[in-house]
Amino acid sequence: MAEPVLRVDGLTACYGQLQAVRGVSFGVEAGEALAVIGENGAGKTTLFHSICGLHGAASGHVVFDGEPLRGVPAHDIVRRGIALVPEGRRIFPSLSVDENLRVAEDQHGRGRRGPARARRWTRERVYELFPDLRAAARRGGHQISGGQQQMLAIGRALLSEPRLLLLDEVSLGLSPAIVKVVYQALAAIRAEGMTLVFVEQDVRKSLAFSDHVVCLHKGSVRLTGRSQAQSLDDVRRAYFG
């Protein structure tokens, strides 16, 4: 078995006296997709924030590509190849779609540095991945649909050239047609070898798209394993505790 590109060992994270994440452990190999599922308040977002350096862990370890991440500032974690698409579709609403992407390019040093052939992800590649964004390129972030905002948030994350993409609440509030578009894009990204860890409320979709699943309940792991080896009933029992 290959060494996991991301390994989480005994991770505990707290808000005051509340343990939001309790001794969570899992690993994901390069190029795989791992689904993190659980009810609201299960600790999914806190887990992602702890991996990305946005929330300090009380104990445990996070290792990415053989390097420990605990205590590493969030901006350094981005430079090491991890990007987060947070719940809430974080974009600049007052800027156009194209300006949002330009800002991301410049922020990550991809806008004007080095030859184009050295850049794996560019605005043009984002537009190829999400044609709806090209059509809306001049519209403001506040003028586009929720689905387009999610596409834009994913595109901005990709411009940081990540090797691991974390997506919190992939399809929350999106129509079935837009969910299909988003997952087709994620499948294309995954086919190129990118590692995905994502939160999805739709249990069936989580199992169908992922290689592995981790189910959290009140901050603890209630079920983990290969997705195709799990029955829907077992996952739902773990999901609801």
Task: Enumerate the predicted regions with their spans.
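ABC-type ATPase nucleotide-binding domains, specifically the catalytic core motifs of the NBD
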Residues: 16, 57, 72, 97-119, ...
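Conserved catalytic motifs of ABC-family nucleotide-binding domains
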Residues: 161
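Conserved ABC transporter NBD signature motif
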Residues: 60-69, 80, 114, 118-123, ...
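The feature captures the beta-strand-to-loop junction immediately N-terminal to the Walker
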Residues: 37-39
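Helix-to-loop junction immediately C-terminal to a conserved catalytic motif
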Residues: 52
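Conserved ABC ATPase signature
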Residues: 140-144
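ABC ATPase C-loop
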Residues: 157-158
